Amino acid sequence: ISAFVDMMNEKLAELGCQESHFENPSGLNGDNQYVSAYDMALIAQAAFQNETFVTIDSSLYYDLPPTRLNPDGFRVYPGHRMLKKNTPQYYAGVIGGKTGYTMLAGNTLVTCAEKNGMKLITVILNGHQTHYTDTKALLDFGFANFQSVNIADADSTYSSVSNDMTIAGLPAADLSVLHMQKDCYVTLPKT
Protein backbone atom coordinates (compact mmCIF):
# COMPACT_ATOMS: atom_id res chain seq x y z
CA ILE A 1 0.00 0.00 0.00
CA SER A 2 2.81 2.44 0.83
CA ALA A 3 4.20 2.18 -2.73
CA PHE A 4 0.77 3.08 -4.12
CA VAL A 5 0.49 6.06 -1.74
CA ASP A 6 3.94 7.18 -2.90
CA MET A 7 2.65 7.06 -6.49
CA MET A 8 -0.38 9.12 -5.44
CA ASN A 9 1.88 11.80 -3.95
CA GLU A 10 4.09 11.76 -7.05
CA LYS A 11 0.96 12.35 -9.15
CA LEU A 12 0.01 15.28 -6.88
CA ALA A 13 3.38 16.88 -7.64
CA GLU A 14 3.00 16.16 -11.38
CA LEU A 15 -0.41 17.92 -11.38
CA GLY A 16 0.99 20.95 -9.56
CA CYS A 17 -0.74 20.21 -6.25
CA GLN A 18 1.22 21.99 -3.52
CA GLU A 19 -1.18 21.92 -0.58
CA SER A 20 -2.04 18.23 -0.37
CA HIS A 21 -0.45 15.02 0.89
CA PHE A 22 -1.79 11.47 1.03
CA GLU A 23 -0.87 8.78 3.54
CA ASN A 24 -3.54 6.23 2.59
CA PRO A 25 -5.35 5.38 -0.65
CA SER A 26 -8.85 5.56 0.86
CA GLY A 27 -8.98 9.30 1.34
CA LEU A 28 -10.01 8.83 4.95
CA ASN A 29 -8.50 11.01 7.66
CA GLY A 30 -4.88 10.50 8.65
CA ASP A 31 -2.40 12.32 10.87
CA ASN A 32 -0.46 13.60 7.86
CA GLN A 33 -3.17 13.53 5.19
CA TYR A 34 -4.53 16.85 3.96
CA VAL A 35 -5.92 18.39 0.80
CA SER A 36 -6.88 21.85 -0.44
CA ALA A 37 -9.90 22.72 -2.58
CA TYR A 38 -7.60 24.04 -5.30
CA ASP A 39 -5.62 20.81 -5.41
CA MET A 40 -8.84 18.77 -5.54
CA ALA A 41 -9.89 20.87 -8.54
CA LEU A 42 -6.56 20.10 -10.25
CA ILE A 43 -7.04 16.39 -9.55
CA ALA A 44 -10.61 16.52 -10.88
CA GLN A 45 -9.51 18.42 -13.98
CA ALA A 46 -7.02 15.66 -14.80
CA ALA A 47 -9.54 12.91 -14.05
CA PHE A 48 -12.25 14.43 -16.26
CA GLN A 49 -9.85 14.49 -19.22
CA ASN A 50 -9.84 10.68 -19.10
CA GLU A 51 -12.76 9.33 -21.18
CA THR A 52 -12.86 6.00 -19.32
CA PHE A 53 -13.09 7.82 -15.99
CA VAL A 54 -15.92 10.03 -17.31
CA THR A 55 -17.85 6.99 -18.56
CA ILE A 56 -17.57 5.28 -15.19
CA ASP A 57 -18.14 8.38 -13.06
CA SER A 58 -21.20 9.56 -14.99
CA SER A 59 -22.94 6.17 -14.72
CA LEU A 60 -26.17 6.23 -12.73
CA TYR A 61 -25.68 2.66 -11.51
CA TYR A 62 -23.45 -0.40 -11.77
CA ASP A 63 -24.71 -3.96 -12.08
CA LEU A 64 -22.43 -6.34 -10.20
CA PRO A 65 -22.39 -9.96 -11.40
CA PRO A 66 -24.01 -12.77 -9.41
CA THR A 67 -22.08 -14.27 -6.53
CA ARG A 68 -22.72 -17.06 -4.09
CA LEU A 69 -24.18 -14.56 -1.59
CA ASN A 70 -26.08 -12.57 -4.25
CA PRO A 71 -27.15 -15.08 -6.93
CA ASP A 72 -29.17 -12.42 -8.78
CA GLY A 73 -26.31 -9.93 -8.80
CA PHE A 74 -26.46 -6.56 -7.15
CA ARG A 75 -27.07 -3.00 -8.38
CA VAL A 76 -24.95 -0.24 -6.86
CA TYR A 77 -25.95 3.42 -7.08
CA PRO A 78 -23.22 6.09 -6.84
CA GLY A 79 -23.91 8.84 -4.31
CA HIS A 80 -23.68 12.05 -6.37
CA ARG A 81 -27.28 13.26 -6.31
CA MET A 82 -26.76 16.01 -8.89
CA LEU A 83 -26.58 13.28 -11.56
CA LYS A 84 -29.96 11.79 -10.66
CA LYS A 85 -33.05 13.31 -12.29
CA ASN A 86 -35.32 11.93 -9.56
CA THR A 87 -33.62 13.92 -6.76
CA PRO A 88 -34.15 17.56 -5.74
CA GLN A 89 -30.39 18.09 -6.12
CA TYR A 90 -30.39 17.17 -9.84
CA TYR A 91 -28.49 19.70 -11.98
CA ALA A 92 -28.60 19.47 -15.78
CA GLY A 93 -25.11 19.30 -17.22
CA VAL A 94 -23.39 17.57 -14.30
CA ILE A 95 -20.94 15.04 -15.71
CA GLY A 96 -19.87 13.49 -12.44
CA GLY A 97 -17.87 13.98 -9.30
CA LYS A 98 -17.15 12.56 -5.89
CA THR A 99 -19.03 12.72 -2.62
CA GLY A 100 -17.44 12.18 0.74
CA TYR A 101 -18.05 12.43 4.46
CA THR A 102 -16.14 11.92 7.66
CA MET A 103 -16.76 13.45 11.07
CA LEU A 104 -13.56 15.48 10.77
CA ALA A 105 -13.94 16.55 7.12
CA GLY A 106 -17.71 17.06 7.07
CA ASN A 107 -19.46 16.75 3.73
CA THR A 108 -17.21 17.03 0.70
CA LEU A 109 -18.32 17.30 -2.90
CA VAL A 110 -16.31 17.61 -6.10
CA THR A 111 -18.42 18.22 -9.20
CA CYS A 112 -17.76 18.68 -12.91
CA ALA A 113 -20.49 20.18 -15.09
CA GLU A 114 -20.68 21.36 -18.70
CA LYS A 115 -22.93 23.94 -20.32
CA ASN A 116 -22.59 25.59 -23.74
CA GLY A 117 -19.20 23.97 -24.28
CA MET A 118 -17.71 25.24 -21.01
CA LYS A 119 -16.74 22.86 -18.21
CA LEU A 120 -16.60 24.00 -14.59
CA ILE A 121 -15.29 22.16 -11.55
CA THR A 122 -16.51 22.98 -8.06
CA VAL A 123 -15.07 21.75 -4.77
CA ILE A 124 -16.83 21.93 -1.41
CA LEU A 125 -14.84 20.89 1.66
CA ASN A 126 -16.15 20.75 5.23
CA GLY A 127 -19.73 21.32 4.12
CA HIS A 128 -22.46 21.13 6.70
CA GLN A 129 -25.47 19.76 4.82
CA THR A 130 -25.13 22.60 2.28
CA HIS A 131 -22.69 20.96 -0.11
CA TYR A 132 -25.28 20.47 -2.86
CA THR A 133 -26.84 23.94 -2.56
CA ASP A 134 -23.37 25.51 -2.41
CA THR A 135 -22.32 23.57 -5.52
CA LYS A 136 -25.47 24.66 -7.36
CA ALA A 137 -24.81 28.30 -6.42
CA LEU A 138 -21.20 28.08 -7.65
CA LEU A 139 -22.22 26.43 -10.94
CA ASP A 140 -25.05 28.92 -11.52
CA PHE A 141 -22.67 31.82 -10.86
CA GLY A 142 -19.95 30.38 -13.08
CA PHE A 143 -22.20 29.62 -16.03
CA ALA A 144 -23.98 33.00 -15.76
CA ASN A 145 -20.85 35.12 -15.45
CA PHE A 146 -18.09 33.39 -17.42
CA GLN A 147 -17.56 32.10 -20.95
CA SER A 148 -15.09 29.81 -22.66
CA VAL A 149 -13.29 31.62 -25.49
CA ASN A 150 -11.10 30.04 -28.17
CA ILE A 151 -8.13 32.41 -28.06
CA ALA A 152 -6.48 30.80 -31.09
CA ASP A 153 -9.59 31.04 -33.28
CA ALA A 154 -8.19 33.58 -35.74
CA ASP A 155 -4.51 32.71 -35.91
CA SER A 156 -2.02 30.20 -34.59
CA THR A 157 0.42 32.99 -33.64
CA TYR A 158 -0.95 34.82 -30.67
CA SER A 159 1.71 37.37 -29.77
CA SER A 160 5.31 38.37 -30.22
CA VAL A 161 7.24 39.26 -27.11
CA SER A 162 9.81 42.06 -26.78
CA ASN A 163 13.37 41.48 -25.65
CA ASP A 164 12.74 42.95 -22.19
CA MET A 165 9.77 40.73 -21.33
CA THR A 166 9.99 37.62 -19.18
CA ILE A 167 7.36 34.97 -18.60
CA ALA A 168 7.59 32.86 -15.47
CA GLY A 169 11.25 33.77 -15.14
CA LEU A 170 12.20 32.71 -18.67
CA PRO A 171 14.05 35.29 -20.79
CA ALA A 172 12.21 36.53 -23.86
CA ALA A 173 14.91 35.10 -26.12
CA ASP A 174 13.45 31.68 -25.29
CA LEU A 175 9.91 32.84 -26.11
CA SER A 176 10.17 34.92 -29.30
CA VAL A 177 6.72 33.89 -30.55
CA LEU A 178 3.87 32.25 -28.68
CA HIS A 179 1.87 29.64 -30.57
CA MET A 180 -1.58 28.27 -29.74
CA GLN A 181 -3.14 24.97 -30.62
CA LYS A 182 -6.36 25.27 -32.63
CA ASP A 183 -8.50 24.33 -29.63
CA CYS A 184 -6.88 26.62 -27.05
CA TYR A 185 -9.62 27.89 -24.73
CA VAL A 186 -9.53 30.24 -21.78
CA THR A 187 -12.36 31.03 -19.37
CA LEU A 188 -13.10 34.76 -19.16
CA PRO A 189 -15.73 36.94 -17.49
CA LYS A 190 -18.69 37.75 -19.73
CA THR A 191 -18.83 41.37 -20.80
Where are these regions (language model features)?
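Domain-terminus/edge residues, biased toward the C-terminal soluble/receptor-binding domains
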Residues: 17-21, 31-34, 38-191
